[in-house]
């Protein structure tokens, strides 16, 4: 048998590039436009520095402007003119809708006073029971204040829209349609419900095994609508002191009513929405009070307005029947395990941003992942990328995906809780 040539041996056993080879490529492998690009980048940097110098912006430890731009005299005068105000509560209005109207205010831990209005406040701005700012000399009302809401409740508002869209949620076509009918349609086309003379559904319960896309779909809903989105994790409402959880729920819905349109999303609602029982000790009484406050806010004496409530759980069997009745949660959406077509679609979604070979058979990979959730498939794609990084390649091959399927789907089978949760759902 003739010995193999050297070049064929080198092709069979490729040697990975070391640091010296990479440095050599960086030095001699520059393109024809690299010098022009570097020159343009340097010019942009110099111009940005020049603009900052003209604006008076300098890198400083304190982050203040240059001392030459300080105006201490006007700052001191402004501080003397704007006196700090004291927070009080207007308890009663005497002679309302008249010129000599007076206001009874209660300053905490001091006393009650009958005062008038400041020059900058209109009588229509002040209502009984609201918080106001009063000056420290005559206790005149200077500004109306918004209702007091716990900072921990305010922090639940999602300010930035999530970057997840409906196209990123694979295998949930039916669930997306049901969710859009409840959330988007009443907000965008309320006249359709008025013509029919029906009230739109008010709430949705999403249930299913972990990793099937419940929270992901809620994030897509938040991206789609212009409504304020408030995300509450069930365990956040379980507090140490009696009545704290119920107070947070009241303030949460009070904040939601102040918005033009609002979506409240309770994630892992089984932490507070469990069925009521008496354990003889009273350890769960506070959790049950919090749940009853949610029930009352969902369908109580006060109208809910344009507030939609979404809830997600892995254990719908543990929830209290009072929480699940129609009128509170009108629609129950099941998130099951994705079928073959859905798994193929999920593979394509997760590999959309990856550098993969073109001839990868995603349907074959989907067939090799039976009874797997969307989270499992995402883990497979991540693991395939790790195999490519380990081999110092810039693209992911089909063999990487097959190895990842063996590792994640077959190897991690003992950690999977999907069969266990399928019993509950």
UniProtKB/Swiss-Prot annotation:
InterPro entries per the UniProt record, alphabetical:
26S_Proteasome_ATPase (IPR050221), AAA+_ATPase (IPR003593), AAA_lid_3 (IPR041569), ATPase_AAA_core (IPR003959), ATPase_AAA_CS (IPR003960), NA-bd_OB-fold (IPR012340), P-loop_NTPase (IPR027417), PRS7-like_OB (IPR048723)
Q: What GO molecular function annotations does the UniProt record carry, in alphabetical order?
A: ATP binding; ATP hydrolysis activity
Supply the alphabetized keyword list: ATP-binding, Cytoplasm, Nucleotide-binding, Nucleus, Proteasome
Q: Which Gene3D superfamilies match?
A: 1.10.8.60, Nucleic acid-binding proteins, P-loop containing nucleotide triphosphate hydrolases
The record's subcellular locations are: Cytoplasm; Nucleus
Q: Where does ATP bind?
A: 208-215
Protein task: The 26S proteasome is involved in the ATP-dependent degradation of ubiquitinated proteins. The regulatory (or ATPase) complex confers ATP dependency and substrate specificity to the 26S complex.
Coarsely, its chief localization is cytoplasm
Similarity comment:
Belongs to the AAA ATPase family.
Q: Which organism is it from?
A: Prunus persica (Peach)
In Pfam terms, one family for this protein is: PRS7_OB
Which named protein is this? 26S proteasome regulatory subunit 7
Give the GO cellular component terms, alphabetically: cytoplasm; nucleus; proteasome complex
The UniProt entry, under SUPFAM superfamilies, shows: P-loop containing nucleoside triphosphate hydrolases
Q: Which CDD domains match?
A: RecA-like_PAN_like
């Amino acid at each position: 048998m003739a010995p193999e040539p050297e070049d064929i041996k080198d092709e069979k056993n490729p040697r990975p590039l070391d640091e010296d080879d990479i440095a050599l490529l960086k030095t001699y492998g520059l393109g024809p436009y690299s010098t022009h690009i570097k020159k343009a980048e340097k010019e942009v940097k110099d111009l940005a520095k020049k603009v900052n110098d003209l604006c008076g912006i300098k890198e400083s430890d304190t982050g203040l402007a240059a001392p030459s731009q300080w105006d201490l005299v006007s700052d001191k005068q402004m501080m003397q003119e704007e006196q700090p105000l004291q927070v009080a509560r207007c308890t009663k209005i005497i002679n309302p809708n008249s010129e000599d109207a007076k206001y009874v205010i209660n300053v905490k831990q001091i006393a009650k006073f009958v005062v008038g209005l400041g020059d900058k406040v209109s009588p229509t701005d002040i209502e009984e029971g609201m918080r106001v700012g009063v000056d420290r000399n005559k206790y005149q009302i200077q500004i109306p204040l918004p209702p007091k809401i716990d900072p921990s409740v305010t922090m639940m508002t999602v300010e930035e829209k999530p970057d997840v869209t409906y196209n990123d949620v694979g295998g949930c076509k039916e669930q997306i349609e049901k969710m859009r009918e409840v959330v988007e349609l009443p907000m965008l086309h309320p006249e359709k419900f008025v013509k029919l003379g029906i009230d739109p559904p008010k709430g949705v319960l999403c249930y299913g095994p972990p990793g099937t896309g419940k929270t992901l779909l809620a994030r897509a809903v938040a991206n789609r609508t212009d409504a304020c989105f408030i995300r509450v994790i069930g365990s956040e409402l379980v507090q140490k002191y009696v009545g704290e959880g119920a107070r947070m729920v009241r303030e949460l819905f009070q904040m939601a009513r102040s918005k033009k349109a609002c979506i409240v999303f309770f994630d892992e609602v089984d932490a507070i929405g469990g069925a009521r029982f008496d354990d003889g000790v009273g350890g769960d009484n506070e959790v049950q009070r919090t749940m009853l406050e949610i029930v009352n806010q969902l369908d109580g004496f006060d109208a809910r307005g344009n507030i939609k409530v979404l809830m997600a759980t892995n254990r719908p069997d543990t929830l209290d029947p009072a929480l699940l009745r129609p009128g509170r949660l009108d629609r129950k959406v099941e998130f099951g395990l994705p079928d073959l077509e859905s798994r193929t679609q999920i593979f394509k979604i997760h590999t959309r941003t990856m550098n993969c070979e073109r001839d990868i058979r995603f349907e074959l990979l989907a067939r090799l992942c039976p009874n797997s959730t969307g989270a499992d498939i995402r883990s497979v794609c991540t693991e395939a990328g790790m195999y490519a990084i380990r081999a110092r390649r810039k693209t992911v091959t089909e063999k990487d995906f097959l190895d990842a399927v063996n590792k994640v789907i077959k190897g991690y089978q003992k950690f999977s809780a999907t069969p266990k949760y399928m019993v509950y759902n």
